[in-house]
Amino acid sequence: MAQQQTNPEEVVLGQEAGGARVITLNRPRQLNGISDRVVYLLAQFLEKWEKDENAKLVIFKVALVNGLVMGGGAAMVAPLKFAVVTEKTIFATPEASVGLHTDCSFSYIHSRLPGYLGEYLALTGARLNAKEMISAGLATHFVSSEKLEELEKRLLNLDTGDESAVRAVIEEFSTDVQPDEDSILNKLSTINKCFSAETVEDIIKAFESEASIDGNQWIAPVLKGLRRSSPTALKITLRSIREGRKQSLPECLTKEFRLTMNILRSVVNGDVYEGIRALSIDKDNAPKWNPTTLEEVKNEDIDRVFQPFSSEQELQVPSDDSNRWAVTYSPQISVAHITHGSYLDS
């Protein structure tokens, strides 16, 4: 029987059951947004269990009503050895639409998705369903939401963190799935053709050209969303992902921290605050970007956002980038339960 390790009113709950350890995000009214308190408690539990010889299996449980998996919540899912998604899961990285950039390690993850799918997802904010997440490599197993409770019970009863044993249990409950016929993953040839272009302007120009071809009616609404995003954020995001293709995970995290700090400090402009105003405060969905067009964004301004800090101000991260995306793993097994999703509460 699992034993509660924290106040039931706390924003993160920790449980222990034999060799299993369970982390549950507990902010339903805030859609389980990842705040500084959540990050602090996650670190407390994970650092404690990393030193616990009896801890063999760590299960993350993320659940909320609207089904979105984005921001910090998505970053908790993608690197895990086993990431379980359900029919209710929806994934997105729409940060550019609010004047931010694709952070939380996604310049690393997106740059390693098939072809130029990562650039497409980051620049357009397009959503993927669970089947598409599996196909793209963002999740490992599809389990019907009605089976999650029984799957969790089976995992909690495991007395081992052995990878093959955990995999065998999950595969008892999982179903092989393929993207639907109209899935964006069946349009990768078009995406690769357009989003491999060197600049955001060239990407949009190529995408507009493809939109005129019969059968490409799906492009018009995507273009509309792309044009609504912050021009500055789009350029920062594309450069970050392109750099990510040649960077390690620690290098990407360090870079993303630098970008976030410079954006929040309004080194170039205040687009992120304007985006938040339009989306969350006034909710008019009519942000006034500065500058208003891609052509007006100066290369030297983008360079300023990427400018390194002094060594003592840079993010300090471990040099080891062991994770599913690097094809190496830590001894302990982590399992993500995503009954619905999570997001980043900045």
Predicted regions and their residues:
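Hydrophobic/aromatic residues within transmembrane alpha-helices
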Residues: I23, F60, M76-V77, E132-M133, ...
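An acidic, glycine-rich surface segment that forms the CoA-thioester-binding/catalytic face
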Residues: E47, V62-N66, F106-Y108, R304-L315
